[in-house]
Amino acid sequence: YKRQIVCSGGDGTLDEVVTGVMEKKSSIPIGYIPAGSTNDFANSLFMPKSMTDAASMIMEEKLYHCDIGRFNNQSFTYIAAFGLFTDVAYQTDQDLKNILGHVAYLLEGVKRLFDIKSYHMRIESEELTVEDDFIFGMITNSRSVGGFKNLTGKNVDMNDGLFEVTMITRPKNPLELQEIMTAMLTAEDNTDLIHSFKSARVTITSEEPVPWTLDGEYGGSHTQIEIENCHEALNLYLKSTKNEETRSIGISPLINKKEK
């Protein structure tokens, strides 16, 4: 019989499955039926929103080789983040999430707007080295974060071997905060307050332990982390999409297992 894993749930559920597969250094195919509050990963790959359609997609047995992140000795599927709002996903009450869905995250996030904490960090990669006070940072392989699209920038390719890195420095006044929010919402890199670049490997050190979120789940507090892109490490069942969507996320190549 054919060995494969099929799971249903949100981004956190998929993270648990991928973590187990990565720990075993397995190449077993994974079928994913999105059923969470936000489903960032599924939306980034234009997966069917219908559970029945998602199951049918898995039955087609077409594989997409997706990049996966290594975070010290842990794994993440699409995002490692710290700072403002990043604990909302795992601190929002589960009953509230079940009732309100994505709105529950927004309500929890609004409560944090006036409690902004910064961390002094040094960010090192082949592309950029910078040291500053940061209120937020994310290393992503996704077109959607927290249900919002384009926050990670344009031309995101989920199997190019590179992460999209976004680091936001501490604003000194309300005008700078507004400048940051405008740049993030419009996906325009037109402010010196945000450092955005692509990289396969990033090292981040901090003066104090910083709480991290991995795929919406608590990833522990750390003073030094090494983040590495594991190129095409995940074998995921995924159907072909429209040409314009395919180009925007880098869905290539798809392999039909039945033809091998």
Predicted regions mapped to residue ranges:
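Conserved small/polar residues in nucleotide/adenosyl-binding loops
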Residues: 1-4
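Glycine-rich beta-strand-to-loop/alpha-helix junction loops that act as flexible
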Residues: 8-10, 35
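Short hydrophobic-aromatic micro-motifs
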Residues: 74-87, 131-141, 145-146, 164-167, ...
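Gly/Ser/Thr-rich active-site loops/lids in small-molecule metabolic enzymes
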Residues: 96-104, 153-175
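ATP/nucleoside-binding phosphotransfer catalytic cores, i.e., glycine-rich phosphate-binding loops
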Residues: 125, 131, 157, 167-260
